[in-house]
Regions:
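Structural motif
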Residues: 7-11, 143-147, 191
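Adenosine-cofactor binding site in Rossmann-like domains, unifying the SAM/SAH pocket
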Residues: 89, 120-125, 211-212
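Short catalytic/ligand-binding loop motif for oxyanion handling, primarily in non-cytosolic enzymes
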Residues: 17-19, 47-51, 91-93, 106-110, ...
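Active-site-proximal loop/helix segment associated with metal-binding centers of metalloenzymes
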Residues: 63-72, 94-173
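Core catalytic region of metal-dependent phosphoesterases/phosphodiesterases
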Residues: 1-93, 164, 174, 183
Length: 217
């Protein structure tokens, strides 16, 4: 069976480019045991694929994929793990139009830095990337996939916020940007991750963590 017939879309914090050592390789080897192709949208706890290519030009590649209708990055030893481009944008899978929007702010940034854990300075989209994405938005998408969610949806998920975190000090520029996105386009369904729970929201929006959803062809 062709791996491309079984495409799993991952909404960020995949864990494949985090440690940069044998732990990452072991994880990727385990993924190889499943007859799947992974299409990974970057979260906030992993390196940008363009940085992986820049640092490892002999073992990483980028090309236009007909499977997802856009630019993808991959590690040559693991071609079944495809990473969406840093700046997000348009893709097309099985004839369905898709907008991909990566990145988010790490609310535990200071804790990670104090403890010597990985933190990625490029975790959020840059202002240039945001401007270009807004400028190139289509009028409608069948699906929008992002890591975090629009700020206006937070009242539906505020019970998931961590105790002890002062929300007034959390950088929510990505969430505010996503409000602009949904004000400038329409969509059939919206899927996001980041908040470590599975639930359906209003406006045909779905938060995913453990749950997998089969998309209609």
């Amino acid at each position: 069976e062709n791996r491309l017939d079984n495409l799993l879309i991952v909404l960020g914090d995949f864990g494949a480019n985090y440690f940069f050592n044998a732990r990452d390789r072991a994880f990727k080897e385990r993924l190889a045991k499943f007859p799947l192709t992974y299409f990974v949208i970057r979260g906030n706890h992993e390196e940008r694929p363009s940085v992986m290519l820049e640092k490892n030009p002999m073992s990483w590649s980028a090309f236009e994929s007909t499977a997802v209708g856009g630019t993808i990055y991959f590690e040559d030893n693991y071609p079944y793990i495809m990473y969406a481009k840093d700046e997000g944008g348009d893709y097309c899978i099985n004839g369905k139009t898709i907008c991909v929007i990566p990145g988010a702010y790490s609310i535990d940034k200071e804790y990670r830095l104090r403890n010597g854990w990985s933190w990625f300075s490029g975790e959020q989209m840059t202002e240039i990337e945001k401007t270009n994405l807004l400028k190139n938005l289509a009028p409608h998408y069948d699906y929008i996939f992002s890591h975090t969610c629009p700020l206006s949806w937070e009242p539906q998920i505020c019970d998931l916020f961590f105790d002890g975190i002062d929300e007034s000090k959390v950088d929510k520029s990505m969430e505010s940007f996503l409000d602009k996105v949904i004000s400038k386009t329409t969509y059939g369904e919206y899927f996001f991750g980041h908040f470590h729970d599975d639930r359906d929201l209003e406006n045909n929006a779905h938060m995913l963590f453990h749950k997998a959803v089969k998309l209609t062809k």
